């Protein structure tokens, strides 16, 4: 007999290298308690995009089976993420007249609708409309509902993605007998699990380095200002090792994970690494410092492209909290140090937060997306609870706009 839970939420991260399913229970105080976890190799994606539906479905099913067994439950709905070089981010602005000189939730919904009324091509899908600021009669405000005014403006960040990429993710999930409760942008999910409110307020750039893509999200004033997806990440580091050392790709991945270092000056020149040969060629030994010499140029290229994306945001000079690295490829020694050399800002490695009795498996940077998906689910539950308590009066306008948007699109 399946175990009974009061309120389960499920995060599904369909990555280029792995599929991760995490099941958690939202407890009475609004905290998350881990209930189940499943991880399986992923073989149906390339650079974050589904390229083989059958292989992706099999990977999801394998991770799902593990998670359901551990949680002793049947999963029906999931929060899942999306990334890829097809992702486009932009800022927009809308303005409406306030009907009764006092801003209502309807006015907020109208101004956000005006701000999101941009022209997008038929092959693109709206993925995110996130409010940045509201302005009443020229005055910036955080919470406009209830305030007096004649003109209400909204500044929002909009993200679109390829319609087919989103449809293929949803198709894979549905073929596993699941429904997508929400499709969330991967870097936004990661930011929910690894960034603090203070960092977002003071200015921070999140850099999620996975296997297929490097996702960037820039925050200032507590709001998202810029998003970018760079199609260069851990897989190309592995490819560089395989080609430079003439070793099979699987062995190159193992060498990267076990002995890799992103900064050559930090690598031990006396430490030797065994490099298997191709075909019937025997293995040979290589110093860890020489290995780092292969890795560093690619990591430097990734960080240079990230730096360019941050410059494009127009926020580089006000990122007081610096850079936060997360994702599976961020754990390599030397990443933080090389990042500080290139960004000339403080850099830290971001670990997922927000769950009591956090398992070691989900407290690592590679779990940033899936834990962020759970945090988004938790926040949705908390918002819904507050709405019911207030008899429909929404206390926080950001949550209200998000709930309104999800309900209409």
Task: Pin down the residues of each PLM region.
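Catalytic-loop motifs flanking and including active-site residues across diverse enzymes
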Residues: 233, 237, 331, 366-372
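ATP-binding/phosphotransfer module of carbohydrate and carboxylate kinases, centering on a glycine-rich
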Residues: 304, 308-323, 332-350, 380-383
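Amphipathic, non-transmembrane alpha-helical scaffold segments
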Residues: 292-299, 303
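A structural feature that tracks compact, well-ordered secondary-structure segments
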Residues: 215-217
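Nucleotide/phosphate-binding catalytic cleft detector across ATP-hydrolyzing
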Residues: 1-18, 22-206, 223-224, 234, ...
């Amino acid at each position: 007999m399946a175990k009974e839970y009061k309120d389960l939420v499920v995060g599904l991260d369909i990555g280029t290298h792995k599929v991760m399913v995490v099941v958690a229970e939202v407890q009475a105080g609004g905290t998350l308690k881990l209930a189940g976890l499943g991880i399986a190799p992923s073989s149906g994606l390339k650079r974050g995009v589904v390229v083989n539906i059958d292989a992706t479905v099999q990977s999801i099913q394998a991770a799902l089976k593990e998670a359901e067994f551990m949680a002793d439950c049947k999963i029906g709905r999931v929060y899942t993420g999306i990334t890829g070089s097809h992702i486009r981010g932009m800022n927009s602005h809308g303005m409406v007249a306030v009907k009764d000189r006092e801003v209502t939730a309807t006015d907020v919904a109208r101004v956000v609708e005006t701000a999101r009324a941009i022209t997008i091509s038929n092959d693109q899908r709206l993925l995110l409309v996130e409010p940045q600021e509201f302005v009443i009669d020229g005055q910036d405000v955080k919470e406009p509902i209830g305030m007096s005014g004649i003109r209400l403006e909204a500044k929002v960040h909009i993200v679109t993605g390829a319609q087919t990429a989103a449809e293929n993710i949803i198709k894979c999930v549905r073929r596993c007998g699941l429904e997508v409760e929400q499709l969330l942008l991967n870097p936004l999910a990661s930011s929910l699990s690894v960034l603090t409110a203070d960092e977002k307020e003071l200015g921070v750039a999140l850099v999620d380095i996975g296997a297929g893509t490097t996702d960037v999200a820039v925050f200032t004033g507590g709001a998202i200002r810029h998003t970018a997806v760079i199609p260069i990440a851990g897989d190309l580091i592995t490819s560089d090792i395989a080609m430079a050392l003439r070793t099979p790709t699987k062995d190159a991945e193992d060498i990267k994970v076990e002995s890799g270092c992103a900064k050559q000056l930090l690598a031990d020149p006396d430490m030797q690494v065994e490099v298997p040969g191709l075909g019937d060629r025997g293995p040979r030994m290589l110093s860890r410092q020489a290995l780092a010499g292969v890795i560093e140029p690619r990591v430097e290229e990734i960080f240079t492209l990230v730096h360019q994306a941050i410059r494009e945001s127009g926020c580089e000079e006000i990122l007081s909290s610096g850079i936060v690295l997360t994702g599976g490829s961020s754990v390599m020694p030397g990443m933080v140090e090389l990042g500080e050399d290139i960004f000339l800002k403080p850099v830290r490695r971001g670990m997922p937060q927000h769950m009591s009795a956090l398992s070691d498996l989900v407290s690592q940077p590679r779990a940033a997306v899936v834990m962020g998906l759970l945090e988004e689910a938790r926040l949705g539950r908390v918002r819904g609870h507050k709405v019911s308590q207030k008899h429909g009066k929404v206390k926080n306008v950001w949550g209200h706009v998000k709930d309104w948007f999800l309900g209409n699109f």
